[in-house]
């Protein structure tokens, strides 16, 4: 089974930072997914504006974390709890697995930031609240 983890922000951010090389901003918020014994995934949010935030998902690579309750919690935070209109994903162009995963979640390709990384470009992805299939219909306005 498993459960969403809301406590222990520092531990969650540190775990995700190790997995995906994330450099946390001061405004970072984190939730995790645990199988009861081990942390399996973390969703990070940062770069908040009135309508948007950046969203980053880190996992242990096993697939044990990819559960509907975790995806619901991950998308309910920005769209239901914070009432944001969209989330943004910033994916290194070379990270084809992450890009494929994000597109499968429903993100749309919106642009390219050339030479944004020392050895790569960044692909900009966006997901609008009304496009998010993981939150209940009444919140997709």
Feature locations, PLM:
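C-terminal "cap" of GNAT-fold acetyltransferases
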Residues: 116-141
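Conserved acetyl-CoA pyrophosphate-binding loop and the N-cap/start of the following alpha-helix
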Residues: 66-74
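Acetyl-CoA-dependent GNAT
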Residues: 6-52, 62
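A conserved beta-turn-beta hairpin within the catalytic core of GNAT-like acetyltransferases
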Residues: 46-57, 83-85, 118-121
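Conserved catalytic-core motifs of GNAT/GCN5-like acyltransferases
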Residues: 90, 108-123
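A short, internal acetyl-CoA/4′-phosphopantetheine-binding micro-motif in the GNAT/acyltransferase core
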Residues: 56-66, 92
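Conserved active-site alpha-helix within GNAT-family acetyltransferase domains
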Residues: 94-111
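Conserved GNAT acetyl-CoA-binding A-motif
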Residues: 80-91
């Amino acid at each position: 089974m498993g459960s969403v983890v809301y406590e222990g922000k520092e531990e969650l951010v540190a775990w995700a930072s190790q997995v995906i090389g994330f450099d946390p901003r001061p405004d970072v918020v984190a939730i995790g997914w645990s199988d009861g014994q081990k942390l399996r995934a973390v969703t990070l949010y940062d770069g908040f504006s009135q309508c948007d935030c950046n969203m980053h998902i880190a996992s242990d690579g096993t697939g044990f974390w990819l559960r509907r309750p975790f995806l619901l919690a991950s998308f309910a935070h920005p769209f239901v709890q914070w009432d944001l209109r969209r989330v943004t994903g910033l994916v290194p162009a070379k990270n084809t697995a992450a890009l494929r995963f994000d597109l499968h979640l429903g993100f749309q390709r919106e642009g390219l930031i050339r030479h944004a990384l020392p050895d790569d470009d960044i692909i900009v992805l966006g997901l609008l609240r009304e496009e998010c299939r993981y939150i209940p219909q009444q919140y997709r306005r």
